[in-house]
């Protein structure tokens, strides 16, 4: 079973994350941030992985520490669940429309952390959450999962729709990248490891 479990406690946050890459899309999410919870549910459901995320953070300061630290923990959990990466497809790219918006996400589980995030988020907030934290979340996740992650928003008007299309495209791209292909002997690299 490909399961990653991480607990992380700092002066700013207390977080527990468990991810089962071979799950059924079940989730229990509670970060104290409604819109963020909603987006994390998209990763589990559309990535068809089981995910538990419990976070208590200094939300009285702002949401930055909680969002970034959840990204750190999800990234570390993905890395742990992948183990030696034997027979994974490694790459995944997916486009998702959400009404008037269109986003693309491309994942390489390369062991080389990198993020490219292109696109305009029209409003500075959705609900009570600052939309600039979306990029911070994906940066923390990508660097701690040691993945190369490209996200591009092509267009959209409604900021909720844009962000939802980003999270769904990430979920589908990740699902493809972590998928097992028995024809792949060892790892998908001429180096012999990733």
From Swiss-Prot:
Its main location: cytoplasm. Keywords: Amino-acid biosynthesis, Cytoplasm, Histidine biosynthesis, Lyase. The keyword Cytoplasm applies. GO terms for molecular function: imidazoleglycerol-phosphate dehydratase activity. Pathway: Amino-acid biosynthesis; L-histidine biosynthesis; L-histidine from 5-phospho-alpha-D-ribose 1-diphosphate: step 6/9. It catalyses: D-erythro-1-(imidazol-4-yl)glycerol 3-phosphate = 3-(imidazol-4-yl)-2-oxopropyl phosphate + H2O. GO terms for cellular component: cytoplasm. It is an enzyme of class 4 (lyase). It comes from the Bacteria. PROSITE patterns: IGP_DEHYDRATASE_1 (PS00954), IGP_DEHYDRATASE_2 (PS00955). It holds the Pfam family IGPD. It is found in: Cytoplasm. InterPro entries: IGPD_sf, ImidazoleglycerolP_deHydtase, ImidazoleglycerP_deHydtase_CS, Ribosomal_Su5_D2-typ_SF. Its EC number is 4.2.1.19. One of its GO terms (biological process) is L-histidine biosynthetic process. The keyword ATP-binding does not apply. Belongs to the imidazoleglycerol-phosphate dehydratase family. This is Imidazoleglycerol-phosphate dehydratase. It comes from Clostridium kluyveri (strain ATCC 8527 / DSM 555 / NBRC 12016 / NCIMB 10680 / K1). The lineage of its organism: Bacteria, Bacillati, Bacillota, Clostridia, Eubacteriales.
């Amino acid at each position: 079973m490909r399961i990653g479990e991480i607990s992380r406690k700092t002066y700013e946050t207390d977080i527990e994350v468990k991810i089962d890459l071979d799950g059924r899309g079940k989730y229990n999410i509670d970060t104290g941030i409604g819109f963020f919870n909603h987006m994390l549910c998209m990763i589990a459901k559309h990535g068809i992985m089981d995910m538990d995320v419990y976070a208590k953070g200094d939300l009285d300061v702002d949401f930055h520490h909680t969002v970034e630290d959840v990204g750190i923990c999800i990234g570390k959990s993905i890395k742990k669940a992948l183990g030696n990466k034997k027979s994974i497809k490694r790459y995944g790219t997916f486009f998702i429309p959400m009404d008037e918006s269109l986003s693309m996400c491309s994942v390489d589980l390369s062991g080389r952390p990198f993020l490219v995030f292109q696109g305009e988020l029209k409003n500075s907030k959705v609900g009570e959450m600052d939309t600039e934290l979306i990029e911070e979340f994906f940066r923390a996740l990508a660097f701690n999962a040691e993945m190369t992650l490209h996200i591009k928003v092509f267009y959209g008007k409604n900021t909720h729709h844009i962000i939802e299309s980003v999270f769904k495209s990430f979920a589908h791209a990740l699902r493809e990248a972590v998928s097992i292909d028995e024809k792949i002997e060892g790892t998908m690299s001429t180096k012999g490891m990733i």
